[in-house]
């Protein structure tokens, strides 16, 4: 999604709409939490003025993220709206972070799309069902997950001999 300043000034109108689908599989390398990302749709509008171009667009798609509890893949749909301003020449009076200076006479919004998606990743995400196929194991070597009820009924093996002695005393 690149446009040169020359292309933008040759537009018949002072604005144009765009609707593109892009593959951003490299995001899986930038953030290991993203296990897979579907093709991302970028749809929006650009308004062209003599010294600047403003973009108002929506980024939508779906990515697979690990469940914070079970590490099962969880689909995470996203829809992000953003506004970005590109100016053709640097001026000292602009201090806004959302203002981008056009370099090499080319405007490329792909890095902005990537950044917005990375910022959209939640700190924690949980799958709907804990018993979902592929959920975390319930036991392993020298450990197992048990309920509180089972924990209460279980006797500490170190005290098992003492319990036998107490039962013998009760019987006598």
From Swiss-Prot:
Residues 130-154 are annotated as: Disordered. InterPro entries: YceD. It comes from the Bacteria. This is Uncharacterized protein YlbN.
């Amino acid at each position: 999604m690149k446009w040169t300043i020359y292309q933008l000034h040759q537009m018949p109108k002072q604005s144009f709409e765009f609707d593109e689908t892009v593959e951003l599989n490299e995001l899986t390398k930038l953030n290991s939490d993203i296990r897979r990302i579907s093709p991302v749709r970028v749809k929006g509008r650009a308004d062209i003025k003599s010294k600047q171009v403003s973009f108002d667009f929506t980024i939508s798609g779906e990515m697979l993220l690990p469940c914070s509890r079970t590490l099962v893949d969880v689909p995470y749909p996203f829809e992000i709206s953003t506004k970005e301003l590109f100016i053709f020449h640097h001026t000292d009076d602009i201090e806004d972070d959302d203002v981008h200076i056009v370099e090499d006479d080319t405007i490329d919004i792909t890095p902005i799309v990537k950044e917005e998606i990375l910022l959209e990743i939640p700190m924690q995400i949980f799958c709907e069902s804990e018993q979902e196929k592929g959920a975390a194991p319930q036991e392993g070597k020298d450990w197992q997950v048990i309920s509180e009820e089972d924990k209460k009924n279980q006797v500490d093996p170190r005290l098992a001999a003492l319990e036998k002695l107490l039962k013998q005393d009760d019987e006598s």
